[in-house]
Amino acid sequence: MTESETTSKKVNKRVKPVPKSTKAGLIFPVGRIHRMLKNKVPLKRVSILSSVYLAAILEYLASEVLELTISQVSIQSKEYHNVRRISPRHLLLAIKTDEELDNLIRVSTTIAGGGVIPYIHEVLKKVEQKPTHPQQKQTIKSI
């Protein structure tokens, strides 16, 4: 092989582009988020680091909600057998049981098919009454 052949082979090898998500170690698409941010910002000047940061935040929130939802599914599968799917009901219960997520998502958010949060008012709950004995009443009156 001559020198020109070896250099031409080196030139023909192109380095495959590595996605920004892979570089950042994320699953959410950093490039797509960056493009969407550029479309929304009036000056169209957005740092790539802000896109990476936003993608990381969204990925964390999604994983947190998914983890809580899976725990709700496991709780219900103990009560009702053969529960194997995540439903909107599980999602709603997971969000409402976590105080921080509830505060974050509470404002004008409705999950379709989620139902309502189970709540029994204190007045409607049965109150256990202690049995009163006539002897106890007499001792109270005598004092």
UniProtKB/Swiss-Prot annotation:
Q: What is its main location?
A: nucleus
**An example Gene Ontology CC term for this record:** nucleus
Q: Which domain of life is it from?
A: Eukaryota
Nucleus is among the record's keywords: yes
List the transmembrane segments. none
How does this polypeptide assemble, per the annotation? The nucleosome is a histone octamer containing two molecules each of H2A, H2B, H3 and H4 assembled in one H3-H4 heterotetramer and two H2A-H2B heterodimers. The octamer wraps approximately 147 bp of DNA.
What role is this protein assigned? Core component of nucleosome which plays a central role in DNA double strand break (DSB) repair. Nucleosomes wrap and compact DNA into chromatin, limiting DNA accessibility to the cellular machineries which require DNA as a template. Histones thereby play a central role in transcription regulation, DNA repair, DNA replication and chromosomal stability. DNA accessibility is regulated via a complex set of post-translational modifications of histones, also called histone code, and nucleosome remodeling.
Query: Could you tell me what this protein is called?
Result: Histone H2A.z
Per the UniProt record, the lineage of the source organism begins with: Eukaryota, Amoebozoa, Evosea, Eumycetozoa, Dictyostelia
